[in-house]
Amino acid sequence: MEKKTYSYDEAFNASLEYFNGDELAARVWVNKYAVKDSFGNIYEKSPVDMHWRIANEVARIEAKYPNALSSQELFDLMDHFKYIIPQGSPMTGIGNNYQIASLSNCFVIGLDGNADSYGAII
């Protein structure tokens, strides 16, 4: 089954609506995080599609363990970046069958001192 593709304008306009008119957020999402193949075909229309992709992939792994969260529960935690906020490479790579992407990223942790340093980043 062939997966639906979207034009840049379709993805941008849907993302613009998702981000309540924030053009920068919409452009960054389409340019950096929407799933694309090596030919530049766009397979996600908005961050809603991305959150479902990530939720479905995480739920697939979760199902192997007791008390697994469902795709819907995971989606609800991510939708509109509410609670779980994937960052950078993981946002592009999790569940992406079109490109190989790193799933690692840096994390900022709480510190008692100055958090504006290399020491605050793992």
Regions flagged by a language model, labelled:
Residues 1-122:
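Extended catalytic cores of very large enzyme megasubunits
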